[in-house]
C-alpha cells in the first residue's frame, strides 16, 4: 500500500512527468498512431440523472477526515463517480467513461443491470435479512444453481461476504481435513488482506509485518518473467522440491489463481496445475482454486479458470463477479471435506443473506441468458489481437497476455531486461483517463495495465481502448 501511495504521489509531480516523457523519447522505439485525432468513446443510449450531491473535493475531504489512512485513490485528480450503466461510469459533471476495470473485476454483468436490479429490489420488498437459523428459499435456490455449475463432486456451498473470507475459510477447511498446518501458495499471488490470508498473499505492497507461520511460497510459473519460461513441469518440480526440503513432508493444501489478478494478469504456465495437484495430493494436501477474479465465464474459453488447466480442485473459492457488486463470496467443496466443520458451529451472519442470494442467482441467470462466456471469448480474442498489433509498433509494451476479458499489458523500459516502466505507466494511466478510459494497474511494480471490464464490453469498446492506448503512447 505504501509503495502504491508513493507512486501515485510521485505521479503528481510535473518533474516526474517530464522525466517519464524524456525516458520514452530516449529509450523507446515508437511508431505514429494510426489515428491523427484522439479516438471518441462509442455511442451509448443513456441519460444520467442530474447530480446534486457533494463535489469531488468535498468527498475527498470527508474520506481524509473519517476513513482510514490506508485508503488510496487513483489519479492525480480523484474521480467522483456518481452513476453507472452497463460498461460505463459517469462523473459528477455527467461525463461518461469506459469502465475497463469493472470495480476491480467485480461488476460482471454490467453496472445496474436491469435483471439483477429487479431481483434485488423484489427481494428487498419482501425480506431484507434472515440468517440461516431460519429457512428461506433464496439461499437454497442460489446454492443449487451454483453447485450445478461445478464439476465432479464439488456440491457443498458455504456463503460468505468477500474473497478474503472465502480464502480464510478454505484454508481452515484444508487444515482441519488434513490435520496439517502447512500451506503452499505462489509468489506474486494475492489471496486477501485478512490476518490469515495476508500470509497466502506474496506481494510486499499488501503485507503487514504479522506472524504468517506455516505458509510457503513457491516459484511463480510466469511465462513472461519466470525462470523456466513456459515450462510448467520445471515449475512443478520446484513445488515437489519445496515439499521435500521446506516442509514436514505433509501439507494441508495448495492455493493458486489460474490467472493472477492483482499480480498483473499472469496466466500460469501450461500444464502446471495438473502436475502440481498430483504432487500436493501425494503429500496429503488438498488443492484450492481461487476463482475470485477468473470465474463465471470471464476467461471466455471456460466457465472456471481452473478448467483451462484441465484440473478439478478439492475446494473452490469465489467472490467479486459472483454478485455483480453485492458483498458476496462463496466456498464450494466436496461433502467429505465439508464434513470436518460439522463438529463445531460455523456461522456467518450475512452469508446467504436473502437479498445477496437473490442477486447472485440473477447473476448466474444473466450470464447464461446473455451468453456472456461466449461473448468474452469473442470480444477478448479481438481485444488481445489488436493489442498485439499495437505491441509491434511500440517497444514499451513488453507483454500482452490473458484470456477472454481478463487481460494484462505489461510496460517495460527495456524489452531485453524487462525493466518495469513505472514512471511511464503512471503517465499513460492519466492520459487514458483524460481520453475517457478507466483501467486498473497491477503487478509488484505497478507497471501492468489490468483490462478486466464488465462482460458486456463490446468490440467497439475494445477498439476505442486500443486506439486510445496507441494514440497516447505515440504522443509521449
UniProtKB/Swiss-Prot annotation:
InterPro entries (alphabetical): Aminotrans_3, Aminotrans_3_PPA_site, PyrdxlP-dep_Trfase, PyrdxlP-dep_Trfase_major, PyrdxlP-dep_Trfase_small
Indicate whether Ribosomal protein appears among the record's keywords: no
> What does the record give under GO molecular function?
alanine-glyoxylate transaminase activity; pyridoxal phosphate binding; zinc ion binding
Q: Describe the reaction catalysed, as an equation.
A: glyoxylate + L-alanine = glycine + pyruvate
SUPFAM superfamilies in the record: PLP-dependent transferases
**Which residues are modified to N6-(pyridoxal phosphate)lysine?**
320
Primary localization class, coarse: mitochondrion
Presequence positions on this chain:
1-12
Q: List GO BP terms, alphabetically.
A: photorespiration
**Which cofactors does the annotated protein need, by name?**
pyridoxal 5'-phosphate
Q: Where is this chain's protein located in or outside the cell? A: Mitochondrion
UniProt keywords (A-Z) are: Aminotransferase, Mitochondrion, Photorespiration, Pyridoxal phosphate, Transferase, Transit peptide
Spell out the GO cellular component terms annotated for this protein, sorted alphabetically and separated by semicolons. Answer: mitochondrion; plant-type vacuole; plasma membrane
Enzyme Commission (EC) number: 2.6.1.44
Q: How does it assemble?
A: Homotetramer.
PANTHER family reported in the protein's UniProt record: ALANINE--GLYOXYLATE AMINOTRANSFERASE 2, MITOCHONDRIAL, PTHR45688
The family classification in the record reads: Belongs to the class-III pyridoxal-phosphate-dependent aminotransferase family.
- What is the designated name of this protein? Alanine--glyoxylate aminotransferase 2 homolog 1, mitochondrial
From what organism does this protein derive? Arabidopsis thaliana
Q: Which gene encodes it?
A: AGT2
